Regions:
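N-terminal basic, Ser/Thr-rich segments that initiate or prime the first beta/alpha elements at protein or domain
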Residues: 1-186
């Protein structure tokens, strides 16, 4: 699932919620438009309403990054324009990755859906001692990428995410105990 907050929407507190569906083939342009609509859970809503719907689709998902979710300060040299918008973190059930200066998007991947976790580090990244962790799923539209992470942190992320993904496939996910109230339109 992806929470998208384009630049001009943020002033109004608007967001879009999308879902990446596995194995959708596109044969014609008309089918492409229909599939885009089918992938959009809510095209435009207040951020509170989008987060309410997210809580219904993915219980216990928290798309707001914790204070330590950002990249190390030396990554500012590698990604000067997007540095403040990069974040990555994971919990007991989900992996989160936030990117985008103009169109900020937070990708939320259930650990049970993780197919592979990869560590990438090009020559420029190695110069700054940072790396990227890619979390792959069966969907084809996007992937969760933890960009510009400290190289040691990235290795630990790969290890922890892989281990938690393996464990999560063994245990059925819990259901929310209380119904979630609908936020007021505002």
């Amino acid at each position: 699932v992806r929470v998208v907050e384009p630049f001009f929407w943020r002033a109004f507190g608007w967001a879009r919620l999308e879902v990446d569906v596995a194995r959708q083939s596109v044969s014609r342009e008309a089918d492409r438009d229909a599939q885009q609509v089918a992938r959009t859970l809510i095209p435009v809503a207040s951020r509170d309403q989008a987060l309410w719907l997210l809580a219904r689709v993915m219980p216990d998902a928290h798309p707001n990054p914790p204070p330590d979710a950002g990249p190390p300060s030396r990554a500012r040299l590698k990604a000067p324009l997007s540095f403040h918008f990069l974040a990555a973190w994971f919990g007991q059930r989900y992996v989160y990755a936030r990117t985008g200066r103009v169109q900020m998007s937070t990708i939320i991947v259930p650990l049970v859906k993780v197919q592979s976790v990869r560590l990438k580090s090009g020559p420029l990244q190695r110069t700054f001692h940072v790396a990227t962790v890619d979390v792959d799923t069966a969907g084809r539209r996007w992937q969760a990428s933890a960009r510009c992470r400290d190289e040691h942190e990235a290795v630990e992320m790969v290890r922890h995410i892989s281990e938690r993904a393996r464990l999560s496939r063994r245990v059925p996910p819990p259901r929310p105990a209380n119904p979630i109230p609908v936020p007021a339109a505002g």
